[in-house]
């Protein structure tokens, strides 16, 4: 919940102090690296877009969806402005874009992307802790671990089914589903992977301490074991 910024992770701060530090980092990046550099005058509107993205970590959405949401709040902005905001947030390393990959057509899609946060503490600092957000933040952790290991990471679209992550590194590939509690989601998570007709590794990563083993070639692993694995 307090994230991995070095000053916080290596320090001995309570939760309140940690979030104050994270808030300072966020405000510094937003103020110095984005709003001033790009001459953003409506800071409140920009900040609301940022919060929308943070609220929807791990969910697919489009620039049009943000425009419609803002319209519902009585605010007006263009799709082009949203694209600019997202691009600037990426360049400031606040968010990271994860595109969808059509596994049948073998093409990268340009719509309904997901975004992940550079550090989980940004979500909890700005929005507070909500147990319902744990699953999305698990995805956030797995996404960055795959990136750290050198994979290009995509959302998998296999006909009408979604695979949380398709990770590609040179001639290697693996498929990953992420779920908080394995027994509750096991049928859907495993079934989606079993529909992929190739022999690349397939994983379900979970926080369930009792989960483990192999279901028809799909490996069930705890998050900690997945993070500590030298390779897959």
Summary of predicted features, one role per range:
Residues 5, 9-171:
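Accessory nucleic acid-recognition modules appended to NTPase machines
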Residues 127-129, 188, 214-215, 232:
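Short conserved micro-motifs at the rims of enzyme active sites and ligand-binding pockets
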Residues 156-157, 180-224:
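Catalytic cores of nucleic-acid endonucleases
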Residues 98, 118-120, 179, 205-208:
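Structured loops at beta-to-helix junctions and adjacent beta-edge loops in soluble globular domains
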Residues 2:
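Internal, well-ordered alpha/beta segment that forms a basic, Gly-enriched binding/recognition surface
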Residues 176:
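Conserved beta3 VAIK motif of the Hanks protein kinase fold
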Residues 223-232:
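Non-catalytic C-terminal interaction segments of nucleic acid-processing enzymes
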């Amino acid at each position: 919940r307090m994230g991995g910024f070095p000053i916080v992770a290596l320090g001995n701060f309570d939760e309140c102090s940690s979030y104050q530090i994270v808030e300072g980092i966020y405000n510094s990046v937003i103020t110095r690296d984005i709003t001033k550099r790009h001459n953003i005058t409506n800071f409140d509107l920009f900040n609301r877009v940022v919060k929308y993205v943070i609220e929807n970590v791990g969910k697919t959405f489009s620039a049009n969806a943000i425009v419609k949401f803002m319209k519902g709040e009585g605010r007006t902005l263009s799709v082009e402005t949203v694209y600019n905001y997202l691009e600037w947030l990426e360049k400031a390393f606040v968010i990271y874009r994860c595109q969808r990959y059509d596994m049948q057509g073998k093409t990268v899609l340009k719509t309904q992307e997901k975004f992940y946060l550079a550090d989980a503490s940004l979500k909890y600092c700005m929005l507070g802790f909500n147990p319902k957000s744990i699953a999305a933040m698990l995805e956030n952790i797995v996404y960055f671990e795959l990136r750290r290991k050198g994979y290009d990471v995509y959302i998998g679209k296999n006909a009408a089914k979604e695979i949380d992550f398709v990770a590609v590194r040179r001639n290697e590939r693996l498929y990953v589903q992420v779920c908080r509690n394995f027994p509750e989601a096991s049928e859907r998570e495993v079934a989606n992977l079993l529909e992929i007709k190739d022999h690349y590794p397939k994983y379900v990563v979970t926080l369930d301490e009792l989960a483990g083993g192999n279901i028809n070639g799909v490996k069930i692993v705890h998050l900690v074991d997945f993070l500590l694995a030298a390779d897959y």
